[in-house]
Amino acid sequence: MEVSAEQPRWVSHPHHPALLNGQHTDSHHQVHNYMDPSQYPPPEDMDVLFNIDAQGNHVPSYYSNSVRTVPRYPPPHHGSLVCHPSILQSWTDGRKSLGGPHAASAWNLPFTKPSIHHNSPGGLSVYPPASSASLATGHSSPHLFTFPPTPPKDVSPDPSISTSGSTSSSRHEEKECVVSKYQVSLGDTGMKLESLHPRNSMSGIGGVSAHHPITTYPDYYGAGLFQPGSILDGSPTHFSSNARPKTRSSTEGRECVNCGATSTPLWRRDGTGHYLCNACGLYHKMNGQNRPLIKPKRRLSAARRAGTSCANCQTTTTTLWRRNANGDPVCNACGLYYKLHNINRPLTMKKEGIQTRNRKMSSKSKKSKKFHDSLEDYPKSSSFSPAALSRHMSSLSHIPFSHSSHMLTTPTPMHPPSSLSFGPHHPSSMVTAMG
Protein backbone atom coordinates (compact mmCIF):
# COMPACT_ATOMS: atom_id res chain seq x y z
CA MET A 1 0.00 0.00 0.00
CA GLU A 2 1.36 3.39 -0.96
CA VAL A 3 1.90 6.02 1.69
CA SER A 4 0.76 9.58 1.21
CA ALA A 5 2.97 12.60 1.72
CA GLU A 6 1.15 13.52 4.93
CA GLN A 7 2.06 10.19 6.47
CA PRO A 8 5.68 9.46 5.59
CA ARG A 9 6.71 5.92 6.17
CA TRP A 10 10.04 6.91 7.69
CA VAL A 11 8.63 8.81 10.68
CA SER A 12 6.47 6.99 13.19
CA HIS A 13 4.17 8.69 15.64
CA PRO A 14 5.66 8.99 19.14
CA HIS A 15 2.42 7.77 20.73
CA HIS A 16 1.84 4.78 18.53
CA PRO A 17 0.28 1.83 20.38
CA ALA A 18 3.08 -0.42 19.32
CA LEU A 19 5.60 1.97 20.80
CA LEU A 20 3.69 2.00 24.04
CA ASN A 21 4.23 -1.73 24.26
CA GLY A 22 7.98 -1.24 24.59
CA GLN A 23 8.89 -2.22 21.04
CA HIS A 24 11.78 0.15 20.51
CA THR A 25 15.54 0.06 20.80
CA ASP A 26 18.08 2.43 22.31
CA SER A 27 20.00 3.43 19.24
CA HIS A 28 19.57 6.04 16.56
CA HIS A 29 20.29 5.19 12.95
CA GLN A 30 21.65 8.09 11.06
CA VAL A 31 23.64 6.26 8.48
CA HIS A 32 25.59 8.59 6.29
CA ASN A 33 26.69 6.37 3.40
CA TYR A 34 25.08 3.31 1.87
CA MET A 35 26.18 0.44 -0.29
CA ASP A 36 24.78 -0.96 -3.43
CA PRO A 37 21.45 -2.73 -2.82
CA SER A 38 22.72 -5.74 -4.75
CA GLN A 39 25.20 -6.43 -1.96
CA TYR A 40 22.50 -6.75 0.70
CA PRO A 41 22.14 -10.08 2.49
CA PRO A 42 19.01 -12.15 1.88
CA PRO A 43 15.81 -10.72 3.35
CA GLU A 44 15.33 -13.66 5.68
CA ASP A 45 18.70 -12.86 7.34
CA MET A 46 17.92 -9.21 7.88
CA ASP A 47 15.71 -7.70 10.49
CA VAL A 48 12.54 -6.06 9.46
CA LEU A 49 13.26 -2.36 9.47
CA PHE A 50 10.00 -0.60 8.70
CA ASN A 51 6.58 -2.03 7.99
CA ILE A 52 3.12 -0.76 7.19
CA ASP A 53 0.08 -2.90 7.81
CA ALA A 54 -2.97 -3.22 5.59
CA GLN A 55 -4.79 -0.38 7.35
CA GLY A 56 -2.08 2.13 6.53
CA ASN A 57 -0.88 2.42 10.11
CA HIS A 58 2.76 2.50 10.91
CA VAL A 59 4.45 -0.40 12.56
CA PRO A 60 7.25 0.48 15.04
CA SER A 61 10.55 0.64 13.32
CA TYR A 62 13.67 -1.25 14.13
CA TYR A 63 15.55 1.91 15.09
CA SER A 64 14.60 4.71 17.41
CA ASN A 65 16.08 8.00 18.42
CA SER A 66 18.99 7.34 20.75
CA VAL A 67 19.53 11.03 21.33
CA ARG A 68 16.56 10.96 23.66
CA THR A 69 16.75 7.40 24.88
CA VAL A 70 20.43 6.80 25.56
CA PRO A 71 21.39 9.69 27.86
CA ARG A 72 18.22 9.92 29.93
CA TYR A 73 16.64 6.45 29.48
CA PRO A 74 13.02 7.59 29.08
CA PRO A 75 9.98 5.28 28.99
CA PRO A 76 9.41 3.38 25.75
CA HIS A 77 6.62 5.68 24.53
CA HIS A 78 8.95 8.72 24.27
CA GLY A 79 10.96 7.46 21.33
CA SER A 80 10.58 8.63 17.76
CA LEU A 81 12.18 7.81 14.48
CA VAL A 82 14.25 10.43 12.69
CA CYS A 83 15.83 10.10 9.30
CA HIS A 84 17.72 12.74 7.38
CA PRO A 85 15.84 14.03 4.31
CA SER A 86 18.93 13.90 2.14
CA ILE A 87 19.27 10.21 2.88
CA LEU A 88 15.68 9.61 1.78
CA GLN A 89 16.31 11.39 -1.48
CA SER A 90 19.35 9.28 -2.16
CA TRP A 91 17.20 6.17 -2.60
CA THR A 92 14.88 7.72 -5.17
CA ASP A 93 17.22 7.27 -8.09
CA GLY A 94 18.42 3.83 -6.94
CA ARG A 95 21.63 4.17 -8.86
CA LYS A 96 24.30 5.31 -6.42
CA SER A 97 24.81 6.16 -2.78
CA LEU A 98 25.73 9.54 -1.40
CA GLY A 99 29.31 8.65 -0.46
CA GLY A 100 31.79 6.17 -1.77
CA PRO A 101 33.06 3.86 0.94
CA HIS A 102 31.19 3.08 4.08
CA ALA A 103 31.90 5.93 6.51
CA ALA A 104 31.63 5.37 10.23
CA SER A 105 30.64 8.12 12.55
CA ALA A 106 29.95 8.33 16.22
CA TRP A 107 26.38 7.11 15.69
CA ASN A 108 27.27 3.92 13.84
CA LEU A 109 26.77 1.45 16.64
CA PRO A 110 26.09 -2.11 15.47
CA PHE A 111 23.42 -4.37 16.77
CA THR A 112 24.76 -7.68 17.91
CA LYS A 113 21.65 -9.70 17.23
CA PRO A 114 21.41 -10.86 13.60
CA SER A 115 17.62 -11.13 13.57
CA ILE A 116 14.60 -10.47 15.70
CA HIS A 117 14.06 -14.18 16.33
CA HIS A 118 17.57 -14.69 17.70
CA ASN A 119 17.62 -16.80 20.83
CA SER A 120 20.36 -15.06 22.81
CA PRO A 121 19.55 -11.61 24.18
CA GLY A 122 21.74 -8.91 22.73
CA GLY A 123 22.33 -5.22 22.87
CA LEU A 124 24.71 -2.59 21.79
CA SER A 125 28.28 -3.75 21.60
CA VAL A 126 31.54 -2.10 20.75
CA TYR A 127 32.57 -4.96 18.47
CA PRO A 128 30.87 -5.33 15.08
CA PRO A 129 28.97 -8.55 14.37
CA ALA A 130 29.78 -10.84 11.51
CA SER A 131 26.89 -9.54 9.42
CA SER A 132 28.10 -5.96 9.77
CA ALA A 133 31.64 -6.92 8.95
CA SER A 134 30.52 -8.64 5.77
CA LEU A 135 28.53 -5.64 4.67
CA ALA A 136 31.32 -3.11 5.12
CA THR A 137 33.44 -3.95 2.10
CA GLY A 138 34.78 -0.45 1.62
CA HIS A 139 35.09 0.05 5.35
CA SER A 140 38.34 1.36 6.81
CA SER A 141 39.92 -0.55 9.69
CA PRO A 142 39.78 2.13 12.43
CA HIS A 143 36.00 2.62 12.00
CA LEU A 144 34.39 -0.54 13.34
CA PHE A 145 30.90 0.73 14.10
CA THR A 146 28.35 0.38 11.29
CA PHE A 147 24.65 -0.19 10.78
CA PRO A 148 22.91 -2.39 8.26
CA PRO A 149 21.80 -0.25 5.32
CA THR A 150 18.28 1.11 5.18
CA PRO A 151 16.14 -0.29 2.34
CA PRO A 152 14.94 2.11 -0.38
CA LYS A 153 11.48 3.55 -0.63
CA ASP A 154 10.18 1.24 -3.32
CA VAL A 155 11.11 -1.92 -1.44
CA SER A 156 8.15 -3.23 0.53
CA PRO A 157 8.93 -5.68 3.30
CA ASP A 158 7.12 -8.91 3.66
CA PRO A 159 3.94 -8.34 5.70
CA SER A 160 3.90 -11.87 7.03
CA ILE A 161 7.38 -11.53 8.46
CA SER A 162 6.63 -8.12 9.91
CA THR A 163 3.43 -9.10 11.67
CA SER A 164 4.79 -12.32 13.06
CA GLY A 165 8.05 -10.68 14.08
CA SER A 166 6.31 -7.79 15.81
CA THR A 167 3.99 -10.04 17.78
CA SER A 168 6.44 -12.76 18.77
CA SER A 169 9.33 -10.50 19.73
CA SER A 170 7.57 -7.90 21.87
CA ARG A 171 8.80 -9.38 25.13
CA HIS A 172 12.18 -10.12 23.56
CA GLU A 173 12.55 -6.47 22.55
CA GLU A 174 11.67 -5.34 26.08
CA LYS A 175 14.43 -7.48 27.51
CA GLU A 176 16.94 -6.26 24.94
CA CYS A 177 15.88 -2.67 25.61
CA VAL A 178 16.83 -3.05 29.26
CA VAL A 179 20.07 -4.84 28.42
CA SER A 180 21.07 -2.29 25.82
CA LYS A 181 20.64 0.53 28.34
CA TYR A 182 23.49 -0.89 30.35
CA GLN A 183 25.57 -2.03 27.41
CA VAL A 184 25.49 1.38 25.75
CA SER A 185 27.73 2.94 28.38
CA LEU A 186 30.74 3.03 26.06
CA GLY A 187 28.77 4.58 23.29
CA ASP A 188 27.25 7.02 25.75
CA THR A 189 30.61 8.26 26.93
CA GLY A 190 32.74 8.01 23.85
CA MET A 191 30.60 8.19 20.71
CA LYS A 192 27.15 9.52 21.52
CA LEU A 193 27.65 13.26 21.55
CA GLU A 194 29.89 13.72 18.55
CA SER A 195 27.10 13.75 15.95
CA LEU A 196 25.07 16.30 17.89
CA HIS A 197 27.21 18.95 16.22
CA PRO A 198 25.94 19.81 12.74
CA ARG A 199 29.47 19.74 11.36
CA ASN A 200 29.86 16.09 12.36
CA SER A 201 26.52 15.09 10.90
CA MET A 202 27.19 16.79 7.59
CA SER A 203 30.68 15.40 7.24
CA GLY A 204 29.36 11.89 6.69
CA ILE A 205 27.08 13.00 3.86
CA GLY A 206 29.77 14.64 1.81
CA GLY A 207 32.35 11.92 2.16
CA VAL A 208 34.18 9.73 4.61
CA SER A 209 33.87 10.84 8.22
CA ALA A 210 37.12 11.62 9.99
CA HIS A 211 35.90 10.81 13.51
CA HIS A 212 37.21 7.83 15.34
CA PRO A 213 35.13 5.70 17.72
CA ILE A 214 37.48 6.63 20.56
CA THR A 215 36.69 9.89 22.26
CA THR A 216 38.91 12.79 21.29
CA TYR A 217 39.23 15.63 23.75
CA PRO A 218 39.67 19.34 23.03
CA ASP A 219 43.01 21.04 22.88
CA TYR A 220 42.62 22.88 26.15
CA TYR A 221 42.93 19.60 28.04
CA GLY A 222 46.46 19.03 26.83
CA ALA A 223 47.77 22.47 26.02
CA GLY A 224 47.04 24.38 29.18
CA LEU A 225 47.13 21.81 31.91
CA PHE A 226 49.51 19.11 30.74
CA GLN A 227 52.49 20.42 28.88
CA PRO A 228 54.89 17.90 27.37
CA GLY A 229 57.71 17.12 29.72
CA SER A 230 56.33 19.07 32.64
CA ILE A 231 55.71 15.97 34.72
CA LEU A 232 57.60 13.15 33.05
CA ASP A 233 60.71 15.07 32.16
CA GLY A 234 60.75 17.02 35.41
CA SER A 235 61.04 20.40 33.78
CA PRO A 236 62.11 23.01 36.32
CA THR A 237 59.82 25.62 34.83
CA HIS A 238 56.85 24.50 36.92
CA PHE A 239 58.41 23.18 40.09
CA SER A 240 61.59 25.16 40.70
CA SER A 241 60.59 28.57 39.41
CA ASN A 242 60.34 29.96 42.93
CA ALA A 243 63.55 28.30 44.14
CA ARG A 244 65.83 31.03 42.89
CA PRO A 245 68.99 31.72 44.85
CA LYS A 246 68.96 34.95 46.78
CA THR A 247 71.30 37.43 45.22
CA ARG A 248 72.83 40.37 46.99
CA SER A 249 72.92 42.61 43.96
CA SER A 250 71.61 45.58 45.94
CA THR A 251 74.62 45.42 48.27
CA GLU A 252 77.26 45.26 45.55
CA GLY A 253 79.61 48.23 45.55
CA ARG A 254 78.96 49.22 49.17
CA GLU A 255 81.86 49.85 51.48
CA CYS A 256 82.03 50.87 55.10
CA VAL A 257 83.38 54.44 55.34
CA ASN A 258 84.99 53.67 58.70
CA CYS A 259 86.74 50.32 58.36
CA GLY A 260 86.39 49.66 54.62
CA ALA A 261 84.46 46.40 55.00
CA THR A 262 82.58 45.23 51.88
CA SER A 263 80.50 42.42 53.42
CA THR A 264 78.40 42.62 56.54
CA PRO A 265 75.18 40.98 57.72
CA LEU A 266 73.51 44.38 58.04
CA TRP A 267 74.36 47.70 56.46
CA ARG A 268 73.82 50.82 58.56
CA ARG A 269 74.15 54.57 57.97
CA ASP A 270 75.75 57.32 59.96
CA GLY A 271 74.38 60.82 60.49
CA THR A 272 75.50 62.00 57.06
CA GLY A 273 73.99 59.02 55.21
CA HIS A 274 77.21 57.13 54.55
CA TYR A 275 77.18 53.36 54.75
CA LEU A 276 78.61 51.69 57.82
CA CYS A 277 79.07 48.04 58.54
CA ASN A 278 77.12 46.50 61.36
CA ALA A 279 80.00 46.71 63.85
CA CYS A 280 80.90 50.34 63.11
CA GLY A 281 77.26 51.36 63.03
CA LEU A 282 76.55 49.80 66.42
CA TYR A 283 79.67 51.34 67.91
CA HIS A 284 78.72 54.77 66.58
CA LYS A 285 75.19 54.38 67.88
CA MET A 286 76.27 53.34 71.38
CA ASN A 287 79.29 55.60 71.89
CA GLY A 288 78.55 58.51 69.62
CA GLN A 289 81.92 58.30 67.92
CA ASN A 290 83.58 56.29 65.22
CA ARG A 291 84.80 52.85 65.97
CA PRO A 292 88.60 52.81 66.41
CA LEU A 293 90.35 51.01 63.61
CA ILE A 294 93.43 49.95 65.63
CA LYS A 295 92.64 47.65 68.48
CA PRO A 296 94.14 48.71 71.81
CA LYS A 297 96.96 46.57 73.08
CA ARG A 298 95.88 44.05 75.62
CA ARG A 299 97.34 44.57 79.06
CA LEU A 300 99.71 41.89 80.17
CA SER A 301 98.47 39.40 82.65
CA ALA A 302 98.75 40.50 86.23
CA ALA A 303 100.70 37.39 87.09
CA ARG A 304 103.28 38.12 84.42
CA ARG A 305 103.62 41.84 84.84
CA ALA A 306 107.35 42.54 84.77
CA GLY A 307 108.93 44.62 87.55
CA THR A 308 105.94 44.49 89.83
CA SER A 309 106.15 43.07 93.33
CA CYS A 310 103.89 43.08 96.34
CA ALA A 311 104.67 45.90 98.79
CA ASN A 312 103.76 43.63 101.72
CA CYS A 313 105.08 40.13 100.98
CA GLN A 314 107.36 40.94 98.03
CA THR A 315 105.84 38.28 95.76
CA THR A 316 105.89 38.72 92.02
CA THR A 317 103.13 36.26 91.05
CA THR A 318 99.48 36.74 91.79
CA THR A 319 96.14 36.33 90.08
CA LEU A 320 95.12 39.93 90.65
CA TRP A 321 97.14 43.00 91.53
CA ARG A 322 95.60 45.43 93.97
CA ARG A 323 96.63 48.71 95.56
CA ASN A 324 96.80 49.63 99.22
CA ALA A 325 95.81 52.91 100.82
CA ASN A 326 99.12 54.49 99.83
CA GLY A 327 98.72 53.41 96.19
CA ASP A 328 101.42 50.78 96.26
CA PRO A 329 100.77 47.55 94.37
CA VAL A 330 100.04 44.56 96.50
CA CYS A 331 99.19 40.98 95.65
CA ASN A 332 95.67 39.71 95.76
CA ALA A 333 96.07 37.91 99.08
CA CYS A 334 97.59 40.91 100.90
CA GLY A 335 95.17 43.41 99.46
CA LEU A 336 92.15 41.24 100.31
CA TYR A 337 93.40 40.61 103.82
CA TYR A 338 93.90 44.33 104.42
CA LYS A 339 90.44 45.07 103.05
CA LEU A 340 88.81 42.62 105.43
CA HIS A 341 90.89 43.18 108.60
CA ASN A 342 92.30 46.71 108.09
CA ILE A 343 95.75 45.44 108.93
CA ASN A 344 98.55 44.18 106.79
CA ARG A 345 98.70 40.52 106.13
CA PRO A 346 101.38 38.77 108.28
CA LEU A 347 104.31 37.30 106.40
CA THR A 348 103.87 33.95 108.15
CA MET A 349 100.74 33.36 106.03
CA LYS A 350 102.70 33.62 102.81
CA LYS A 351 102.61 30.48 100.63
CA GLU A 352 104.68 29.48 97.68
CA GLY A 353 101.77 28.24 95.65
CA ILE A 354 98.61 30.11 94.81
CA GLN A 355 95.52 28.47 96.15
CA THR A 356 92.71 28.86 93.63
CA ARG A 357 89.11 27.76 93.45
CA ASN A 358 87.04 26.70 90.47
CA ARG A 359 84.83 29.73 89.93
CA LYS A 360 83.74 28.82 86.41
CA MET A 361 80.42 27.41 87.57
CA SER A 362 77.89 30.03 88.60
CA SER A 363 75.35 29.72 91.35
CA LYS A 364 72.53 28.98 88.92
CA SER A 365 74.47 26.18 87.33
CA LYS A 366 75.22 24.79 90.78
CA LYS A 367 71.53 24.74 91.61
CA SER A 368 70.67 23.06 88.33
CA LYS A 369 73.42 20.50 88.90
CA LYS A 370 72.06 19.70 92.34
CA PHE A 371 68.59 19.35 90.86
CA HIS A 372 69.79 16.94 88.18
CA ASP A 373 71.74 14.96 90.74
CA SER A 374 68.64 14.65 92.85
CA LEU A 375 66.68 13.46 89.81
CA GLU A 376 69.34 10.88 89.03
CA ASP A 377 69.32 9.63 92.60
CA TYR A 378 65.52 9.55 92.72
CA PRO A 379 65.08 6.09 91.14
CA LYS A 380 67.64 4.69 93.53
CA SER A 381 65.74 5.99 96.55
CA SER A 382 62.29 5.48 95.12
CA SER A 383 59.55 4.24 97.37
CA PHE A 384 59.06 1.28 95.06
CA SER A 385 62.54 -0.08 95.68
CA PRO A 386 62.80 -3.04 98.08
CA ALA A 387 64.92 -1.11 100.58
CA ALA A 388 62.46 1.76 100.71
CA LEU A 389 59.56 -0.63 101.07
CA SER A 390 61.24 -2.39 103.96
CA ARG A 391 61.92 0.93 105.70
CA HIS A 392 58.34 2.00 105.09
CA MET A 393 56.99 -1.22 106.48
CA SER A 394 59.19 -0.97 109.54
CA SER A 395 57.91 2.53 110.21
CA LEU A 396 54.32 1.33 109.97
CA SER A 397 54.83 -1.73 112.13
CA HIS A 398 53.55 0.02 115.26
CA ILE A 399 50.10 0.63 113.73
CA PRO A 400 47.74 -2.23 114.69
CA PHE A 401 46.49 -3.61 111.36
CA SER A 402 44.83 -6.95 111.02
CA HIS A 403 46.78 -7.38 107.77
CA SER A 404 50.46 -6.59 108.05
CA SER A 405 50.78 -6.00 104.30
CA HIS A 406 48.36 -3.05 104.32
CA MET A 407 50.16 0.20 103.48
CA LEU A 408 47.57 2.90 104.18
CA THR A 409 48.98 5.52 106.53
CA THR A 410 45.79 6.65 108.22
CA PRO A 411 46.13 8.76 111.38
CA THR A 412 45.16 6.77 114.42
CA PRO A 413 43.38 9.55 116.35
CA MET A 414 40.79 9.92 113.58
CA HIS A 415 40.13 6.20 113.33
CA PRO A 416 40.30 3.95 116.37
CA PRO A 417 42.22 0.69 116.03
CA SER A 418 39.00 -1.28 116.14
CA SER A 419 37.67 0.52 113.10
CA LEU A 420 40.84 -0.11 111.08
CA SER A 421 40.31 -3.84 111.05
CA PHE A 422 39.84 -4.78 107.40
CA GLY A 423 39.52 -8.48 107.97
CA PRO A 424 37.07 -10.43 105.87
CA HIS A 425 35.37 -11.78 108.97
CA HIS A 426 34.38 -8.23 110.10
CA PRO A 427 32.36 -6.67 107.27
CA SER A 428 30.80 -4.08 109.58
CA SER A 429 34.15 -2.48 110.45
CA MET A 430 34.26 -0.50 107.17
CA VAL A 431 30.83 0.94 107.84
CA THR A 432 31.91 1.90 111.32
CA ALA A 433 35.04 3.63 110.04
CA MET A 434 33.17 5.54 107.36
CA GLY A 435 30.29 6.40 109.65
UniProtKB/Swiss-Prot annotation:
Residues 357-370 have a biased composition (Basic residues). Gene3D superfamilies: Erythroid Transcription Factor GATA-1, subunit A. The keyword DNA-binding applies. The keyword Methyltransferase does not apply. GO terms for biological process: cell fate commitment; embryonic organ development; immune system development; negative regulation of transcription by RNA polymerase II; positive regulation of transcription by RNA polymerase II; regulation of epithelial cell differentiation. One of its GO terms (molecular function) is DNA-binding transcription factor activity, RNA polymerase II-specific. It comes from the Eukaryota. It is found in: Nucleus. This is GATA-binding factor 3. It comes from Xenopus laevis. The lineage of its organism: Eukaryota, Metazoa, Chordata, Craniata, Vertebrata.
